[in-house]
Amino acid sequence: MKDRIPFAVNNITCVILLSLFCNAASAVEFNTDVLDAADKKNIDFTRFSEAGYVLPGQYLLDVIVNGQSISPASLQISFVEPALSGDKAEKKLPQACLTSDMVRLMGLTAESLDKVVYWHDGQCADFHGLPGVDIRPDTGAGVLRINMPQAWLEYSDATWLPPSRWDDGIPGLMLDYNLNGTVSRNYQGGDSHQFSYNGTVGGNLGPWRLRADYQGSQEQSRYNGEKTTNRNFTWSRFYLFRAIPRWRANLTLGENNINSDIFRSWSYTGASLESDDRMLPPRLRGYAPQITGIAETNARVVVSQQGRVLYDSMVPAGPFSIQDLDSSVRGRLDVEVIEQNGRKKTFQVDTASVPYLTRPGQVRYKLVSGRSRGYGHETEGPVFATGEASWGLSNQWSLYGGAVLAGDYNALAAGAGWDLGVPGTLSADITQSVARIEGERTFQGKSWRLSYSKRFDNADADITFAGYRFSERNYMTMEQYLNARYRNDYSSREKEMYTVTLNKNVADWNTSFNLQYSRQTYWDIRKTDYYTVSVNRYFNVFGLQGVAVGLSASRSKYLGRDNDSAYLRISVPLGTGTASYSGSMSNDRYVNMAGYTDTFNDGLDSYSLNAGLNSGGGLTSQRQINAYYSHRSPLANLSANIASLQKGYTSFGVSASGGATITGKGAALHAGGMSGGTRLLVDTDGVGGVPVDGGQVVTNRWGTGVVTDISSYYRNTTSVDLKRLPDDVEATRSVVESALTEGAIGYRKFSVLKGKRLFAILRLADGSQPPFGASVTSEKGRELGMVADEGLAWLSGVTPGETLSVNWDGKIQCQVNVPETAISDQQLLLPCTPQK
């Protein structure tokens, strides 16, 4: 039998050539005399005699419209022969029966949908009313390709899909976490253990998302034999939300923060309806706030707003930049930098956006009603209603305003934004507040704000003067009113605030410059100033490529006093990594360090080693060492750091972040996924160990994994890493796309085959063989091969022990059981028994 294998392969090659020829002709009649077949009458050529012919029946196919998949997974599509009309009517090819639900996924305009009619008892779409639509099935590849003129489709671009293509995902549960632990020992004998955590738990059902944010910590210290322990845990908020694509808005119920572009943010319990710029094409969207600073050691950075933790992570020593905050965050943020020696520095960042401009004819709005909430879940104050809106009056002008109505507290704001063209964009507004406090007088005051933004294209620079704000002594925000009424706290009444951001690139010098400055004055306490300035340059010298020099300075608060820091870093490529020198100054102390940093494992692992001298400040010099390591595994993002200061302290810290996602389609542990955000559950057909998303995600033993770097409402592309696939695994559908609504658990299925490649001889119960050209499919409906001369079939992706189906004349005729001990390099004689 082995001697006949080359001949069998030639027969299969002949069939492939015939099928290719059929694609170029409308109809073909075959001369079977050229084939060396034992029974030339037992040949099923129906699938080759017409171009695009598909045997009637059901197929599992991926529907591709203009190169883009329309569904999370392959769809079960029936091929139906159209009914004959008249005695002499020509028999038509079986047609793909696309249901109305499938058609709605294609992104057709409303006018185009009206032109689609249905046949076969209203089950199958007919696109003859849309000229230019071309449907081409390829059952071997498991694909149904549809080419459609763009005129029939809604607007889309390379990064955005229309709302009709947005996916609310599948039902499921999630748990996201972020853990940080530090153990430190003081030279004088004291030691401390600190552990903090925060995250989100939630569940999805249809378009609705239920979320609960949590945070907690435990601190234990021992000094002079005395042990103290502090523990705390809180559910910081509970809320329910969903997207309303038709209104380009989000509906939120429960505990939330008012993220206003006009009024100061405050917490509340109630309901809100807010337009969401993320539902617009990317070029029309807003921005996300960025936070920069300097860490003197491997430090923990905590970003919070009104006590709720938004970001908590470890950063290595030196300048840091946090850019992955949610774009919906508005208002003043509190930033705390916790050094390894326990020292804490604080500063604030105002996330005021660029001038409030809206495209002509569009309206952006926010409507909120409820009761104000303190740091816990208790509500306080009267029921309030607030709203704000911006209307694009023309290409140059936008009008905006808002109001807060709460009985004893009311505020009204009005303003305008002006696109000056070449000079930039400008906006100005005024807010009037009236606050009546029981038993005291009424406070009335105004607050003026001026904002400016300009992009200098020729100079490759941005400047944002996002505020000058002046507030009268008796002006009150809602938060200040609540503090005065319920806590008799009239302190920290703002007077003037300046915020300036400047970014400048000098391409000829490979130099970048960044400045962030904020100044806040008060009526009753001393002013505060915060700034961060940095200059970075890259150049080549003495044959070394990519030498970098960076200089930065910043101001923060330490023990209620201003703390100025400066940092210098010089880095030189060395081997696969980077050698560096850094010098820093803070509180009259100077630190000089030499170090080495490297990444490996395709960027999934990195480490840094540093050693140096700490001197100045009237204290003796101290040697200092620290090391930092991070690893991104498929299950979690992990990092560890260690530091030691001579006659000072020794500390060790670890952190981990990740989550668990559980759905009816599968479950997996995963890295990333903070705050219950959008994610994509990928399914590799039950095949484990498949690398996805550049190897950052590897499917588990059940063939599922979770991709968390998914942007809501964007067109996201996720692919199998073909270079890292195991030898016995083949991906026939290796790229999927998704456009998920906020908080969705998306689901996409890759077509992955794992198994052997076999030569099999198929025999029917009477000793005959299936006809030449019969199709062999797996239990999942995937075509694995076709029958050639004498029942010989070359099959790929066969799993030992599975049952295969053999199809001809438009239906399953018999089934084949593959032995558990199938061997690839042998021919197998397999009986094909009638379907049960």
Swiss-Prot record:
Keyword tags: Cell outer membrane, Disulfide bond, Fimbrium biogenesis, Membrane, Signal, Transmembrane, Transmembrane beta strand, Transport
Cellular localization per UniProt: Cell outer membrane
GO cellular component, one term: cell outer membrane
Lipid bilayer topology: Multi-pass membrane protein
Signal peptide: 1-24
Record-level GO BP terms: pilus assembly
UniProt keyword Ribosomal protein, yes or no: no
Disulfide bonding pattern of the chain: C814-C832
Record's keyword annotation contains Signal: yes
Gene3D superfamilies per the UniProt record, alphabetical: 2.60.40.2070, 2.60.40.3110, 3.10.20.410, Outer membrane usher protein FimD, plug domain
Entry GO MF terms: fimbrial usher porin activity; identical protein binding
Protein name (database record): Outer membrane usher protein PapC
Protein species of origin: Escherichia coli
